[in-house]
Amino acid sequence: MFKKFKPVTPGTRQLVLPAFDELTTRGELRGTKSKRSLRPNKKLSFFKKSSGGRDNLGHISCRHRGGGAKQLYRVVDFKRNKDGITAKVVTVEYDPNRSAYIALLSYEDGEKRYILAPKGIQRGDVVVSGEGSPFKPGCCMTLKSIPLGLSVHNIEMRPSSGGKLVRSAGLAAQVIAKSPGYVTLKMPSGEFRMLNEGCRATIGEVSNADHNLRVDGKAGRRRWMGVRPTVRGTAMNPVDHPHGGGEGRHNGYIPRTPWGKVTKGLKTRDKNKSNKWIVKDRRK
């Protein structure tokens, strides 16, 4: 669910932001009419140290990063290894560190953990991990236990390594086939990939599927998120970029990165990397 704004300023003319209707408010917890957002759990959050896109030597390792509002990092449980212990969804919250929403679970033994919130999960729902869990959104189990055709997310690449695949807003993979020791998944990119049947995955799609419809409306909103401007290479001097300099505009060069490497179409995958787990390429 998204909301548009009246074009009373240039910054609001194109602005489209999420309505956050799925999120739990302070009023819901306290029994009031407050619509204010929740603060994260103190024991599961800490302030991130901003790197400004620099590495340990102070060199820029990632361009166009810096500034922005200070962010609290929420510790999310990607392993989902508390088997057989039911957990109740206490809250569904916003997370500035990812496109999806997160849900705070309270387990029967008193422990609390954040997980990626699947689509449709609500406050008060009950989820559980491990074999024999129900096939409903938020429950986690190994791939060999999941029926064919079911949508999954937060998928491990190796058993017990924690979810690595399909974690962004609105994504889901589909269980396509099973063979001795392996399960074939159709990834959101269209790629068919085989994974060990002992890898865990969570049932359902990732929440906030309309994330791609968001329009920030102005450069300042991107700056609040720590994104700095991108300068075109043709607008630079020759000392700064291979595309720089020249009398007027010219287009007689092969597109290159600021470090002189050919880009736009050049294959970057390591030729020695194994493709035996990829059943079908996403581009075919």
UniProtKB/Swiss-Prot annotation:
Residues 232-284 are annotated as: Disordered. Pfam families: Ribosomal_L2 (PF00181), Ribosomal_L2_C (PF03947). The lineage of its organism: Bacteria, Pseudomonadati, Chlamydiota, Chlamydiia, Chlamydiales. It comes from Chlamydia pneumoniae. Keywords: Ribonucleoprotein, Ribosomal protein, RNA-binding, rRNA-binding. This is Large ribosomal subunit protein uL2. The keyword Ribosomal protein applies. Residues 240-250 have a biased composition (Basic and acidic residues). Gene3D superfamilies: 2.30.30.30, Nucleic acid-binding proteins, Ribosomal protein L2, domain 3. One of its GO terms (biological process) is cytoplasmic translation. One of its GO terms (cellular component) is large ribosomal subunit. One of the primary rRNA binding proteins. Required for association of the 30S and 50S subunits to form the 70S ribosome, for tRNA binding and peptide bond formation. It has been suggested to have peptidyltransferase activity; this is somewhat controversial. Makes several contacts with the 16S rRNA in the 70S ribosome. Coiled coil: none annotated. Part of the 50S ribosomal subunit. Forms a bridge to the 30S subunit in the 70S ribosome. One of its GO terms (molecular function) is rRNA binding. Belongs to the universal ribosomal protein uL2 family.
